[in-house]
UniProtKB/Swiss-Prot annotation:
Protein's membrane topology: Peripheral membrane protein
Enzyme class: translocase
Protein family according to the UniProt entry: Belongs to the ABC transporter superfamily. Zinc importer (TC 3.A.1.15.5) family.
Translocase listed as a keyword: yes
GO cellular component: plasma membrane
Listed name of the protein: Zinc import ATP-binding protein ZnuC
Species this chain originates from: Salmonella typhi
Length: 251
């Protein structure tokens, strides 16, 4: 399978501060990669590297030709005094055709929001509108920066179900950043735990058949939500230095 984007031993520094160190990853068609890490771990910087907005100091980045990227930001800041409907907001995107807007909204089950004021949308509705905006680019790579932030568990389940559906329909790669260190999208193909470097990687634990998990999240939630069990052989001290653990290092 040909990668759309690959990073090999990428490092980024801002002044004397090393933000990313020897990070490698691959984004391939039809695959979901979830990036976890604490605040200040370098997740946003890594996303900017993937998007081509930050050039690394070291390492190699390879991209497929004219790669089309759809990006959903972590937050959307709007002037609350500015009258702006969903329709007008989406038309602000360069090269957007009016005829493409409603189909994009319908694709994310948000067609009914086309004339709604942006300021009145819930967290989940806003994420769907931003996702529709990203789809207007017909992306080969979908980058989602903390898409479930401000969304309740039921909203997360619905959003993960939608992301999985879009991934299959478009055969696009998905890079998803998550603020939750343990609860992830169950259908993620690979999880990377980042704290300036890759601390560990693996796949989510299959828990959809656990009675306790089903009781907590319901059958649909148990199908879409997974647990990622970290397996670090080290920890980071208050200065960010690596301290090796004794024993098996599971956390």
């Amino acid at each position: 399978m040909t990668s759309l984007v690959s990073l090999e031993n990428v490092s980024v520094s801002f002044g004397q501060r090393r933000v990313l160190s020897d990070v490698s990853l691959e984004l391939s068609p039809g695959k979901i990669l979830t990036l976890l890490g604490p605040n200040g771990a370098g997740k946003s910087t890594l996303v900017r590297v993937v998007l081509g907005l930050v050039a690394p100091d070291e390492g190699v980045i390879k991209r497929n030709g004219q790669l089309r990227i759809g990006y959903v930001p972590q937050k959307l800041y709007l002037d609350t005094t500015l009258p702006l409907t969903v329709n007008r907001f989406l038309r602000l995107r360069p090269c957007t055709q009016k005829t493409d807007i409603l189909p994009a909204l319908k694709r994310v089950q948000a067609g009914h929001l086309i004339d709604a004021p942006m300021q009145k949308l819930s967290g989940g509705e806003t994420q769907r509108v931003l996702l529709a905006r990203a789809l207007l680019n017909r992306p080969q790579l979908l980058v989602l920066d903390e898409p479930t932030q401000g969304v309740d568990v039921n909203g997360q389940v619905a959003l993960y179900d939608l992301i999985d559906q879009l991934r299959r329909e478009l055969d696009c790669a998905v890079l998803m950043v998550s603020h939750d260190l343990h609860l992830v999208m169950a259908k993620t193909d690979e999880v990377l735990c980042l704290n300036h470097h890759i601390c560990c990687s693996g796949a989510p634990e299959v828990v959809s058949m656990h009675p306790e998990f089903i009781s907590m999240f319901g059958p649909r939630g148990a199908e879409q939500l997974g647990i990622y069990r970290h397996h670090h052989n080290h920890r980071h001290d208050l200065q960010g230095r690596i301290v090796l653990r004794r024993g098996n290092g599971h956390s």
